Amino acid sequence: MADREYTLSQKQAINSSGHNILVSASAGSGKTSVLVERVIQKIINGEDVDRLLVVTFTEAAASEMKERIRAAIVKKINEVSDIELQNHFSMQLNKLNNANISTLHAFCMSIIRNYYYIIDLDPTFRIMDPTESELLKESVWADLREELYERDEDGKFALLTRNFSSDRSDEGLQDLILELFEFSNANPDPQAWLQQIAKNYEVPSDNVMDMEFIQQLLTEVKTKLMRIYRKDLDLTEQAINGGEPLKNAAEKFQNEVDDLKTIIDSLNGSWDDVQQAVSKMKFAQLPRGKKEEVQEFNAYAKSIRNDFKDEFNTIADKYFKLSSEQMIAVFKDAHDLMMKLIEVQNQFAERFLQEKLTRRSLDFSDLEHFALQIVLDDSEEGQAIRRDFQQKFNEVIVDEYQDINPLQETILTSVASPDPGNMFMVGDVKQSIYAFRMADPSLFISKNNQFKDEEQADERIILAENFRSMRNVDDFTNLIFNQVMDTEVGEIEYDDDAQLQFGAKYYPDEVQNNTEVMIYDDSQTDINDKEATPIISNKNDGQLQMIAQRIQKLFADHTQIYDKKEQKMRDLEYSDIALLHSTGSNNLEIVDTFKKYGIPIQVNNAQDYFQTTEVSIMMALLKIIDNPYQDIPLAAVLRSPMVGLKENELAFLRIGKKNGHYFEALLYFLNEAKLDSNNEFQMQLKTKITHFLEQLDHFSKLARQSTLVDLLWAIYDETGYLDYVGGMPDGPQRQNNLHALYDRAKGYEESSFKGLFQFVRFVEKMRDKNKDLAENPVVTDVKAVKLMTIHGSKGLEFPIVFLIDAEHGFNTMDEKGRYVLDRDAGMGITLKDFIHRLEIDTVQKNWIISIKKQKALAEKLRVLYVALTRAEQKLIITGAVNSADDTLNKWAEAVDTDETLIPAEARSKVSNFLDWIGMAIMRVPSVVEKYADYNTRKLQGTLIPDVELKIINSSELMDQQGLTALKSAQIPELQQLNAFDDIADVDKFKQIMNFKYHDEAATTTTAYQSVSEIKRVFDDPDKFELNFSEVDADQHIKPQNRFVTESLMAPRFMNEATKPKAAEIGTATHLILQQLDLNQPINETIIKDKIGELVMNRVLDEQVANRIRISTILDFFDSDLGQLMINHPENVHREEAFSLLLPAKGLFPKVKGDDDVLIHGIIDAYFEMEDRVILLDYKTDFVLPGSVEQGIEKVINRYQGQVNLYAQALGSILKRPVNEKYLYLLSIGRLVEIQ
């Protein structure tokens, strides 16, 4: 280590001492090396390693640091000849094992183990597994909740529950209690923090202006109003200077400015003064007229005025709707609710702690709180312990300081020397990305601002040189953050101290890699033939194929990278590439796409753990072992390799017994069905079912008699499933996933919780929370592209990094709940008025949402910084947009300024990484020249890197697909010819290429068809029988890959950030019709409540929900059929799935064999009356208002065959004919009968 050449700033960080030191270490700046060298230098200078406290973020980091220190000490022993020094180093080597180089939790554990008697704690405690802790919390809360209901004499607990829960469940309050517990526990004094959040609702002297939070709010409002005022004043002055054509507008704008000034002045008066002034504010219209001066002014002023009008209206709506009297009434009710909440929260915390102590168990949070209690104990003995720590540790070294919370900070400062300080804190606030773990970057920011003052004793050291990345990565990162990060949007200035400095001078000068921004443009995808299976199904698919093709091109171009270990250039390998994204929600799609392109890929994070085939099948089997009367898990197991039933076999079993649970159909097939012993199909099916039921019975008995882990291992062993998945693609990973499930079951049983049912329930809860049960990483030397989240990549580096899905929207769910929590601002709630059936968002809630938005945006900027700085040599950013032209126009408008920093309004409205990056690169000279039509101004500066902005559309990808398919054709005969003959045998080539399969039509037809696909093959739907009219099988759509997954992905209309499409609104309307309760009157209020419930439960996107035409739904229920549905709900069946087995050659005449096709569909609704059966299907097709009758005729022609097929299926299920068939056209609210 001594051989390494350190920079001046690194030497300063290694050698400076005698006071508190904060080291701000940018990405790639050699932070760990500096930390280790600092410890080594202290040892060299005679200090004992056990007199240092070194706190790391992870156990792996602590182990690595110990090993590096050990290696350095051993090296010193071998280097020095002085016997005294050798003895000193040898002693340090012995002391290293017991040195306090560990995680904070491990340090807290050592405090408690040594001084447990100070707080009267049983020393025989164990540390709970996080899984056990989660389960115990829920168990404790369930018991406490029942008690609170029973002794709720004043009804306050019921009111609290109703306020934070839905009509159907009281889990809303449970979620709040558990989240509030986590928030409060991240503070040194949870009780004090809880009392403070209630204080925000206290009104001193019945004057809201005396409330501390109101004064903070008004300060923030004044800043925003002053910004609006200045913009309006600027436009007013321009209108005045515009002469006679703008005279009237100038006068109106001047009145606006005066009114704004009045509002700003009123902020020093009473609340009612402000509220009345705000309510009177009216904005004038832009001037009208065709004169050039008017047109030019309007073109300039329109977007500016719209922006500040929107901002003003937001302020007015969120803060100034209520008078002071109304506000006080709301605050009083809210305060009463908060006090009850805090009372319940304290009871839960106490009960949870007592339960843990009874079990002699602690969790990680307890370790921190108990350690703090010991070091802050006011008894004489407690004070002596604190002094001992302060005297023992000559220095307290904290790694990743940006990620600690106030509780952890208090522990560390309590054991450090108070004066002079001896804390050495290292981190990079630009990489603080763990708010969900209660990390508080403000602690770092505060010291960063304080320590840079040279007049005070403490010191700040900047490590800015990046020794990881090539210059192009540094320059691009600086390019982006110079334009988007400051204290207003980002919480810190991206100044000279924050910028990356190029330090990796070992890269060869000839290696040049420009950063690429690749955008898939979905606006041209509609050119695909609507009646054919699209090569690119949607914009996400387009982006993934674009990424795969770019990777293929890297290899086709024989790309080379610089190998730092070998210190030479070499060919690119797949393992040199990493794909980073915000979430793992589309991991499965990415893996599927890469497999199609033959690109090996390894998933390093586990967002989709529960959706992996092997885990979902195992969970399905465990469910039916516990209770076989569950149709979906049972079907999954029967279809899986464990049983291996085919679709036609599944259908045959159901046909035998159409009603009841599917398990009953299995029993009926074995015990009651009349089987033909000469029928090979039936006999083979009987063998499979018999074996399966025997095995299921065996496993059920084992579940009752043995442990969960024994059951799991027996399943793995006796079914051979563990070995089977090892032979699948990514076999080692799949086996590790099953081992992880086994380990989790073992951990579960080692806790106090037992039983298969509880374990299945626990796993489902973890799945719903996207929590725990992560895949075990497979450490292999497989050369594969790495796929991981940005959070998972922190601390890692890769030669080539793709930041993908950059258009993925930020999560804003905090704003939509019934409460919002913030460490600093407290808690904001929605108050329910049950008398008037109103929900009131308190001013506190709206204020805290605003604060959290700012914090969330700052963290998203930091996440982006982490992503960009993982790249060593090349950075490629990808995204997908609905229209590239619209997107580029939006970016160009946002950066219409000569300032380097993009206006805060534009930066704060961003909802994804791509918009920040896009706005920043629109002024890069190379982009300005290439996309000159957008008239953006060039960014001025000397260190502006070239950026390649590429817009890719579907036609370009399709062209490339053809080339890719040709290059990767895997025809063995052709490969042999190509390998051994310089000139291929043309005749043999033709023979191979012209080969015709005897039943070629069957190769283009799947054994499973949905009705929506099969409807395309009807020529004469009115004459539907088992034999269809003649259809050319060649015209049938080629099947896409089919798979079954219990996907938790939201529907498409939950994911689009753009204006909802008509089809999405229709689909949402369809959903409302499906879910409305027919046992209550259907009116506008009921429908709105249902829509609100679906939005709250994240089933519907709010943007789509707002576009649902409630009148369309009411019109349906006003119709005769709608009234029939309301009057006879017991006769109505909705969303009924069916399967129908039909001969394939009847559907596709060119199919020559006797194969069958399983038709599957879902009937929207049917009425089973005494005298008739009525079939109803909702359709979302758009019908032009100007040609309604023609449009209806087209819809009838389009769906007549499908509806007739539904009718045949329904008739066969009910054993009676369908008498009436209807379509309800949602776009026009018309009921149409099908003859």
Curated annotation (Swiss-Prot):
Domain UvrD-like helicase ATP-binding: 4-470
Pfam families on file: PDDEXK_1, UvrD-helicase, UvrD_C
InterPro entries assigned: AddA, DNA_helicase_UvrD-like_C, DNA_helicase_UvrD/REP, P-loop_NTPase, PDDEXK-like_dom_sf, PDDEXK_AddAB-type, Restrct_endonuc-II-like, UvrD-like_ATP-bd
UvrD-like helicase C-terminal domain location: 501-795
Biological processes annotated in GO: double-strand break repair via homologous recombination
CDD domains: DEXQc_UvrD
Entry annotated with the keyword tRNA-binding: no
Keyword terms: ATP-binding, DNA damage, DNA repair, DNA-binding, Exonuclease, Helicase, Hydrolase, Isomerase, Nuclease, Nucleotide-binding
PROSITE patterns: UVRD_HELICASE_ATP_BIND, UVRD_HELICASE_CTER
Cofactor: Mg(2+)
GO cellular component, one term: DNA helicase complex
Residue sites binding ATP per the record: A25, S26, A27, G28, S29, G30, K31, T32
Reaction(s) catalysed by this chain's protein: Couples ATP hydrolysis with the unwinding of duplex DNA by translocating in the 3'-5' direction; ATP + H2O = ADP + phosphate + H(+)
Subunit structure: Heterodimer of AddA and AddB/RexB.
Assigned protein family: Belongs to the helicase family. AddA subfamily.
PANTHER family: ATP-DEPENDENT HELICASE_NUCLEASE SUBUNIT A, UVRD / RECB / PCRA DNA HELICASE FAMILY MEMBER
General function of this protein: The heterodimer acts as both an ATP-dependent DNA helicase and an ATP-dependent, dual-direction single-stranded exonuclease. Recognizes the chi site generating a DNA molecule suitable for the initiation of homologous recombination. The AddA nuclease domain is required for chi fragment generation; this subunit has the helicase and 3' -> 5' nuclease activities.
Protein name per the record: ATP-dependent helicase/nuclease subunit A
Species of origin: Pediococcus pentosaceus (strain ATCC 25745 / CCUG 21536 / LMG 10740 / 183-1w)
